[in-house]
Amino acid sequence: MSTLRDHSNNIRKNIIKMVAEAKSGHPGGSLSIADMLTVLYFDKMNVCAENPKMADRDRFVLSKGHAAPALYATLAEKGFFPEEELITLRKFGSKLQGHPDMKKVAGIDMSTGSLGQGLSAANGMALAGKLDNKDYTVYTISVSYTHLRAHETR
């Protein structure tokens, strides 16, 4: 059974491999959130790789989209797609580009790019969940590492 430390170490290793293979990217910003993503995806969040659009899943928005390698490595570690795909980061035709794209990668709840836009999107998701009486939590990481909670009735 893997521990949070094991998951975090694998995620960090894959971030370095991806950015090195791509010869571009933001390793510092990605490495800085590896532990947070590990705790969220392997301890806190209700997500399912086999059913990534599950209605009452928790949502995650990476507002600092340039740290996408961390999110990709986490999603692969969680089983959303094969780890072997990680080395296609930023390659022509790859679904793993420099910023997350919710239409191309299972497990991504919001496409992000411009710094800060994800915070307002996460706020809208949380409000929609509250208005619809849904039981999910919305998390976001922005440049200031903001944590946004929707509501919990669990």
PLM regions: where:
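Conserved small/polar residues in nucleotide/adenosyl-binding loops
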Residues: 146-153
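Thiamine diphosphate
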Residues: 1-139
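Acidic, proline/serine/threonine- and glycine-rich low-complexity intrinsically disordered segments
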Residues: 142-143
